[in-house]
């Protein structure tokens, strides 16, 4: 009768498991900010400033879209101005012909 000793063989990982993470993604940039410079000539309907909220207010001949984007209502020259002590506004002044 043969008696065999069976070895107690245990295998362990030689590298840590990869695991998972809840990070690793980012939202796309929204390209907010000034789209026309002070003194620049623009046509009617041109976007002047893209923003979230009213960082800059609409002035003369400037409209505000549903997402607070400021756009020119007429063709003219863009002017970024102060509105009171602590606010800013953008206006478009028509070019005299």
Curated annotation (Swiss-Prot):
<comment type="similarity">
    <text>Belongs to the bacterial ribosomal protein bL27 family.</text>
</comment>
<dbReference type="GO" id="GO:0006412">
    <property type="term" value="P:translation"/>
</dbReference>
<keyword id="KW-0687">Ribonucleoprotein</keyword>
<dbReference type="GO" id="GO:0022625">
    <property type="term" value="C:cytosolic large ribosomal subunit"/>
</dbReference>
<dbReference type="GO" id="GO:0003735">
    <property type="term" value="F:structural constituent of ribosome"/>
</dbReference>
<dbReference type="InterPro" id="IPR001684">
    <property type="entry name" value="Ribosomal_bL27"/>
</dbReference>
<dbReference type="Pfam" id="PF01016">
    <property type="entry name" value="Ribosomal_L27"/>
</dbReference>
<protein>
    <recommendedName>
        <fullName>Large ribosomal subunit protein bL27</fullName>
    </recommendedName>
</protein>
<dbReference type="InterPro" id="IPR018261">
    <property type="entry name" value="Ribosomal_bL27_CS"/>
</dbReference>
<keyword id="KW-0689">Ribosomal protein</keyword>
<feature type="region of interest" description="Disordered">
    <location>
        <begin position="14"/>
        <end position="36"/>
    </location>
</feature>
């Amino acid at each position: 009768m043969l008696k065999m000793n069976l070895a107690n063989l245990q295998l362990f990982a030689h590298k840590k498991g990869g695991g998972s993470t809840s990070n690793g993604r980012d939202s796309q940039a929204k390209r907010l900010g000034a789209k026309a410079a002070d003194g620049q000539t623009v046509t009617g309907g041109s976007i002047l400033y893209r923003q979230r909220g009213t960082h800059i207010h609409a002035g003369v001949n400037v409209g505000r879209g549903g997402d607070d984007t400021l756009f020119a209502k007429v063709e003219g020259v863009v002017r970024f101005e102060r509105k009171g002590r602590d606010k800013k506004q953008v206006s478009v002044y028509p070019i005299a012909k």
